[in-house]
Design a protein with these regions (language model features):
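A short, flexible loop at the N-terminus of ABC-type nucleotide-binding domains that lies
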Residues: 2-5, 14-27, 58-64, 80-84, ...
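Short catalytic/signature loops enriched in Gly
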Residues: 4, 143, 239-344
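P-loop NTP-binding/switch modules centered on Walker-like glycine-rich loops
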Residues: 57, 178-182, 186-267
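A short, proline-enriched helix->beta-strand linker immediately N-terminal to the Walker B motif
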Residues: 171-175
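Conserved ABC transporter NBD signature motif
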Residues: 65-76
Length: 348
């Protein structure tokens, strides 16, 4: 039986700005199982990074947690003091950020940047920390580790810098690794290498990963489960196969249709319109204004999470037994035929 290591319940986070309160996170519920990879996907501004940073308590000073809990190993992180969090960050929960150059101190040799984490959290001697740092660099694929520990970040390529950041994150064998778009700043070849490295290290360290990205192609390669976020909410969650091949929410349809595939015609689909202003979120389903299959109820009442399967849920009124049939995009029908087999039945 799987073991839940991290649980987010009814999380609501607002940001106080001169223009008013931005409702960035509007009731997020998520669970992370031990050893699994959960991908958070969605457009910019959907709440992916804010959700992840709230787990580390790394939100800016104008952030206000209005409601909810984040339970890690049976304790609510939101009730922890900054001193308590300093012993959790880097040791039990680690994070890899998008741009490796801004994650590393340009004035400090990379060896010291790795060893200071080990010395702080593991209470190791300098010699023990240096030995561990060498092992970590070799583990993440940096050759001549002993010599390269004496070099500065600018002496490494972008891909190598990201490997170093991963080495720092893994220095204390964390239970959870949060990877916030860790391959966005890298070219496609290096991106594939970093993803393969993360998969290998996950098996070796038996850690759970929250993988944040807007690239669905990346998700297919790394995730066990996927949570689709829109306007500060999770609108669909399921296994990677369920979300990719039997998607239920119109927003998930739009994301998948906008992915180039071998079946893509001359024009690539783009979701019409823009995400809503979270200073004043719309009533009902926030995606209704951009959806060509929106129902009348979408504009007045927010949909609950409907169960598609024991592992698959989606917040769309289209799943209500009373909902009318709506036309399903050709690309989604093609994916469902793969999921169910030709002629198989899926919800319309």
């Amino acid at each position: 039986m799987s073991e839940t290591i991290l649980s987010i319940e009814n999380l609501r986070i607002h940001f106080e700005t001169f223009a008013g309160e931005v409702q960035a996170i509007r009731g997020v519920n998520l669970k992370l199982e031990k050893g699994e990879t959960l991908a958070l996907v969605g457009e910019s501004g959907s709440g992916k990074s804010v959700t992840a940073k709230s787990v580390m308590k790394l939100l800016s000073n104008n952030a206000v947690v209005k409601e909810g809990s984040i339970t890690f190993k049976g304790e609510n992180i939101l009730e922890k003091s900054e001193r308590d969090m300093q012993s959790i960050r880097g040791k039990e929960i680690a994070m890899v950020f998008q741009d490796p150059m801004t994650s590393l101190d340009p004035t400090m040799k990379i060896g010291k940047q790795i060893t200071e984490v080990i010395i702080k959290h593991e209470k190791a001697s300098k010699e023990e920390a240096n030995k561990r740092a060498e092992e970590l660099l070799e583990l993440v694929g940096i050759p001549n580790a002993k010599e390269r520990m004496k070099q500065y970040p600018h002496q490494f390529s972008g891909g190598q810098r990201q490997r170093i950041v991963i080495a720092i994150a893994l220095a204390c064998n964390p239970d959870v690794l949060i990877a916030d778009e860790p391959t966005t700043a890298l070219d496609v070849t290096i991106q594939a290498q970093i993803l393969e490295l993360l998969k290998k290290l996950q098996q070796q360290f038996q850690m759970a990963i929250i993988f944040i990205t807007h690239d669905l192609g990346v998700v297919a390669n790394v995730a066990d489960r996927v949570a689709v976020m829109y306007a500060g909410k999770v609108v669909e969650v399921g296994t990677v196969d369920e979300v990719f091949y039997n998607p239920q929410h119109p927003y998930t349809w739009g994301l998948l249709r906008s992915m180039p595939t071998l079946h893509t015609g001359d024009t690539l689909y783009a979701i019409p319109g823009s995400p809503p202003d979270l200073l004043d979120p719309p009533v009902g389903d926030a995606f209704a204004l951009r959806s060509d299959v929106a129902l009348e109820i979408d504009r007045v009442k927010e949909p609950p999470m409907f169960e598609v399967s024991p592992t698959h849920f989606a917040a769309t009124w289209l799943l209500d037994p009373r909902a009318p049939k709506v036309p399903v995009p050709e690309e989604i029908v093609r994916r469902r035929n793969i999921f169910f087999g030709e002629g198989g039945q899926a919800h319309d």
